[in-house]
Amino acid sequence: MAAYQFVYHMQGLNKTYPGGKKVLDNVHLSFYPDAKIGVLGVNGSGKSTLLRIMAGIDKDFTGDGWVAEGARVGYLPQEPQLDPAKTVRENVMDGVAAKKAILDRYNELAMNYSDETADEMSRLQDEIDAKNLWDLDSQVDQAMDALICPPDDAAVDNLSGGERRRVALCRLLLEQPELLLLDEPTNHLDAETVAWLEGHLRSYPGAILIVTHDRYFLDNVTGWILELDRGRGIPYEGNYSTWLSQKQKRLAQESSEEESRQKVLAAEQEWIAASPKARQAKSKARINAYEDLLAKANEKGPTTAQIMIQTGPRLGGKVIEVEGVSKAFGDRLLIDDLSFSLPPGGIVGVIGPNGAGKTTLFRMLLGLEKPDAGTIAFGDTVQPGYVDQSRDALDPNKTVWQEISGGNEILYLGKREVNSRGYTSAFNFKGGDQQKKVGVLSGGERNRVQLAKMLKEGSNVLFLDEPTNDLDVETLRALEEALENYAGCAVIISHDRFFLDRLATHILAFEGDSHVEWFEGNFEAYEEDKKRRLGIDSTIPKRIQYKKFSR
């Protein structure tokens, strides 16, 4: 039982960004020692800043913010630091250094037992029993496996950004601070690892603040939502679904200008309330409704959609046909004998651990890499659209609005005229943000510009690589609605189970041992099928295995 009523306090806290934008305005909050809190707000509302203040990193604020005496704070930033002089396992073991010191001292005394040290040994044994430290190495192994950490002896310098985050998260969870601050913890995790993390955090013996766009995660872990809105911190008791209902009521009272946001919120709430069977039926119905989607896309007239996608030419019966495709990387076989046929209107969710081969598959489908065996064929009318991640694709001297709109006040999406500033605003570039130079944008902001440009170009098969990573919940919700109404196909790499459940008609799953499963249905239905095929243990995340490949 914590010795304090609240683990953290804020009194009259204010934070202003350079240039004068007030991001936190006279915030008064206190956090219970076992509270699980999801932090929501549009990009730029101060979510990461709030965590940095609570972690003691950002001290440039007025008012008061302090942690309870004796409480430790652990913080996972979006780009965590590791000790480059240590291996992966040595970095993880830093999180249990204090626990290991207790075991080491006990073992040292046991090796040199004497009456003088008997009392200390007895006290240490009680502490080891109470903290369940006898199997500490096994606990570390389990956490590293569940988070699919790189090999124990891997050098930190060679790790990707996603691998660094998994190592840092593993270290932090094993350390078990009284206040855990997590900034986008699900980024770079596959769907099954996210499900494991949910279970771990639900029973975590401390307070947690989570910044995430993953709505299932928010529903399954949190008991409170803290919404940052125009400088205010507004707490709601309940999970994401509860917040969604309360938010809808608040918007209805505030202004008729919020009509389009209310519509999108209502659609999402209706989807959440539907039974799993009804959700799965909806994903199948999309394939049969392709002609209706095409007709709607070509209508004139007003729309309340926040994001619209320009539709390309009508798709024929053949969209993408993959036959017997295999692909190796070095001596590892990533994909072994994959075949599938994508029907018109299909939306494919591509899932699997980092490094499994998802991006390689994407590159083959786009013709940027060739398979080692098998064929990939596109239908005659297919016009693919994808985000070019190279920096050269954007002009650093243009403003955000110029880059997205091409300098045109009106954009033509199908037969609809759309105000270009409104379109740009839908990707959460509002007001003065539209005048920012592209050259000063963050990586996430650049990706939103790329996405906005690509969606107005007129493709009929979209390729999206982790589109949810750089979007706040509001923009993500608008993108989902746009994709639901999109008269085309999409192939989407994502770990966001809510996104996959709501949109996917098919799943391509990298299941390990070089096998990629093609499944008709959404993510929820795929998980049920996987348990039937491979057993309940198949949903426990583990480091991926490959077949050996020899040419």
Predicted regions and their residues:
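Intracellular alpha-helical coupling/juxtamembrane segments of multi-pass membrane proteins
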Residues: 246-279, 283-287, 293-300
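ABC ATP-binding cassette signature C-motif
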Residues: 1-259, 303, 309-551
